[in-house]
């Protein structure tokens, strides 16, 4: 079984594309595959276009408006996740598409409309979306960001749950790279450690991977 954590800027088109990439992999791979989208929620991500995606929201909105938008979107996403991973991911991607592609303005009505479209229990969603439970879930996500040494959005950490407790981090979110990594049962942290050794580094194709303890 593989587990993949994709760390994202929730209001970034490049990260939205990365989500599509890993969703394709989860559908195509034969192994059991657990996938989580983890929003990075801090001041740097709110204010910086890390992925150079020509982020119009960050150009158009004031710092205060951006901070409010990020807070609302991340809280809504965590509330949706309480009703299941798949529904939560569907909620997030629909919210991103409306904000980033359709250039719609965020509102409570939009969030509730998306919740209905995604088959969520709307009353439960409304109750959870500004709850302490959702806020604590965000805090746990940010602890995960720190523990896994994530430096920027559009980073993924892969765990081969059968072979190692350590994870493999990459900032190269491409289909072939991630698909091959998840299919290669020999891609253990021990193998990667040897491939990234000083003697082998110039020849290895694994330069974009790092080991996360």
Describe the residue ranges of each PLM region:
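Active-site-proximal cofactor/substrate-binding loop regions of enzyme domains
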Residues: 1
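Short, thiol/selenol-centered motifs that function as redox-active sites or metal-ligating centers
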Residues: 9-19
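Flexible, glycine-rich phosphate/dinucleotide-binding loops
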Residues: 13, 44, 165
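Structural alpha/beta surface segment adjacent to cysteine/selenocysteine redox centers
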Residues: 18-103
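C-terminal cap of thioredoxin/glutaredoxin-like
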Residues: 5-8, 21-26, 102, 106-213
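Short beta->alpha junction loops/turns
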Residues: 11, 81-84, 130
